[in-house]
């Protein structure tokens, strides 16, 4: 579990660097994001990296002021990753109850809703959602569960 979190954190940092650089310079990040997706292909964080880099790509056209946006997005990202990290410990070690999942979903949703009126609202909503999806993917993988409930939401 610790290795998974370290890998996810490293991948997030690499994607964040591309995202921040692209927002500041206006450079097209498609190739850099594709290289990151290739780098993590076949690893446990492949789905997470794919989803996160796509969010970053989708957000770039929405950014009006890179400095303000990136400061807000960094704060959101740190909060979301803390939910991810704390929840992953439970996902990797225990059977999850509906109450456990509801707490994770609420914690992630609260971050999205608390940024509803900010420039980073789409980033906050999307990133918090992929964290819940990623935790579910890992839980299913670890416990060999085949149902993909999130495909029906």
Regions inferred by a protein language model and the residue ranges of each:
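Amphipathic, heptad-repeat alpha-helical segments
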Residues: 16, 74-95
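Repeat-associated, polar segments at repeat-unit boundaries in modular proteins
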Residues: 42-74, 119-146
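Disulfide-bonded cysteine-rich modules in secreted/extracellular proteins
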Residues: 4-11, 15, 65-80, 145, ...
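Extended non-catalytic scaffold regions that mediate assembly and binding
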Residues: 1, 28-36, 45-52, 100-101, ...
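Charged, low-complexity interaction regions
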Residues: 20-28, 41-46, 91-96, 113-117
């Amino acid at each position: 579990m610790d290795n998974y979190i370290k890998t996810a954190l490293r991948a997030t940092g690499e994607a964040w660097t591309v995202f921040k650089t692209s927002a500041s310079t206006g450079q097209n990040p498609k190739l850099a994001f594709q290289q990151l997706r290739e780098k993590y292909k076949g690893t446990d964080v492949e789905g997470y990296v794919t989803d996160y880099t796509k969010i970053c790509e989708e957000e770039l056209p929405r950014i009006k002021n890179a400095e303000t946006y990136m400061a807000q997005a960094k704060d959101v990202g740190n909060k979301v990753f803390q939910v991810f990290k704390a929840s992953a410990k439970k996902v990797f070690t225990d059977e999850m109850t509906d109450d456990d999942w509801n707490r994770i979903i609420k914690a992630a949703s609260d971050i999205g809703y608390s940024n509803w009126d900010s420039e980073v609202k789409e980033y906050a909503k999307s990133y918090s959602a992929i964290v819940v999806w990623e935790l579910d993917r890992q839980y299913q993988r670890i416990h060999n569960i085949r149902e993909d409930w999130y495909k029906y939401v």
